[in-house]
Amino acid sequence: MSERTRLGVVLLFMRITIFVVMALWTIDKFVDPGHASHVYEAYYGLGGFGVSPIMLIAVVEALILLVFDAGRLKFWTYGFVVIVHGVSTLAAWAQYLDPFAGPNLLFFAAWPMWAAAIALFVLRERDIYTLGRDTR
């Protein structure tokens, strides 16, 4: 197997696994918008979101993630994932200060995923196993 093929397979696996995690958080917005509203208030300081704004965010996020999973519009969709996951990771800064309290240790799993998303963005031109031809 050539280096190009091996790298392509690794990047495909990274894209799919990042998509799965992000998709679950998006599905959570549809299934339990109250939970998403609580997360926005607790971690981002954005309170007062009702069901409609959460659903709108979920729809937009779902559409972007589907395009991301297909490996299309790489600069924009891969960049979106890096930014959204980065903001989410950094917003939980207080949990990193006390890693052994409650479920805080789980928050550290966000760091390698963010690193994977950054690597995927940087290597996006080498991500060759996509649906259709990417015209950016």
Language-model regions: role of each:
Residues 1-31, 51-59, 63, 69-136:
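Extended, low-polarity transmembrane helix blocks
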Residues 30-46:
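Membrane-interface interhelical connector segments
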